[in-house]
Design a protein with these regions (language model features):
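Gly/Ala-rich beta-loop-alpha elbow adjacent to hydrolase catalytic centers
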Residues: 141-146, 150
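Alpha/beta-hydrolase active-site loop
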Residues: 105-131
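C-terminal catalytic histidine-bearing segment of alpha/beta-hydrolase fold enzymes
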Residues: 219-225, 229-264
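A domain-start/cap signature at the N-terminus of enzymes
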Residues: 18-51
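Short, surface-exposed "cap/lid" segments of acyl-processing enzymes
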Residues: 37, 45-81
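Active-site nucleophile loop of the alpha/beta-hydrolase fold
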Residues: 165-174
Length: 264
């Protein structure tokens, strides 16, 4: 009887694990991370062994749907030597595809950059995409909250990313929350400024800041730039005429800055 009960329990566990896996994984629309589906939007002609793999990370959109701006970057940046993907952070949607996990309470109602819940799934999705597409160079671009995640990922996963591009970065999360005077201080969130000593010295980093950005104030990017310079990281700081809304009001300006950083 005990043996039979054990077999039934084992069967139930196996069934649960199988059901929890992301059966939609195709490395085009979804990738599986620890049984969860992480949603993607990317180039139509995805081929392995292209020279570059470029990943784009969005900010903290309130409706948990990243909209069409960042997905539109894909066609502007891709070429025959590049695979380009937008990754929807846990709990967010891209083109009606939703990533599992995240915080259902929404932006400003809880920490947005908790490592295990919000950042690790993205990093592991990037790792799987890198293993699958086998690029010579992996480039990660993040805007606003996506830039914060980018800074944490390069600090936590040394050697994973070859070139990081951070735009409108709240690179010191505790100080940024104080500056914004919104919600809590997000004490459980990871912050890029705490992780600079762990960053791979061979990485290239580009930091893009809007001169009039009153959301993620330029000072947070400038301070992060100084920290990277002290660690002898190859880092470039580029200031442009614009603010935090330039991403959706003048997207071509951001696209051109990304292209310039990639080609430099």
């Amino acid at each position: 009887m005990k043996k039979l009960l054990g077999i039934l329990v084992l069967g139930l566990l196996l069934s649960t694990n199988a059901h929890s896996a992301c059966e939609k994984e195709d490395f085009i629309k979804y990738v599986e991370v620890k049984g969860n589906c992480i949603a993607l939007f990317g180039t139509k002609k995805n081929e392995i062994n292209k020279k570059q793999l470029i990943i784009l990370l969005h900010g903290d959109h309130r409706k948990r749907d990243i909209g069409g701006i960042l997905p539109a970057f894909v066609n502007k940046i891709e070429n025959k030597d590049r695979n380009v993907f937008v990754i929807a952070r846990p709990g967010w949607k891209v083109k009606k595809r939703k990533s599992d996990g995240g915080d259902s309470r929404g932006v400003d109602r809880g920490d947005n950059y908790i490592f295990i819940r919000d950042i690790e799934p993205v990093a592991l999705a990037i790792k799987k995409l890198k293993e699958h597409y086998n690029p010579e160079e992996l480039i990660l671009f993040g805007y606003s909250g996506g830039a914060a995640l980018t800074g944490v990922i390069i600090g936590k996963y040394s050697g994973l990313i070859d070139h990081a591009i951070l735009a409108g970065c709240p690179c010191n999360v505790p100080e940024w929350r104080k500056y914004r005077k919104k919600g809590s201080g997000w004490p459980r969130s990871s912050s890029p400024h705490n992780l600079v000593s762990n960053i791979d010295k061979d990485i290239k980093v580009d930091i893009l800041i809007g001169k009039n950005d009153k959301n993620t104030h330029p000072k947070f990017s400038e301070q992060y730039y100084d920290l990277l310079k002290k660690e002898n990281i190859d880092v470039t700081l580029t200031s442009f005429n614009g603010d935090h809304s330039t991403m959706w009001k003048e997207p071509i300006k951001i696209i051109n800055l990304i292209k310039k950083a990639i080609d430099s």
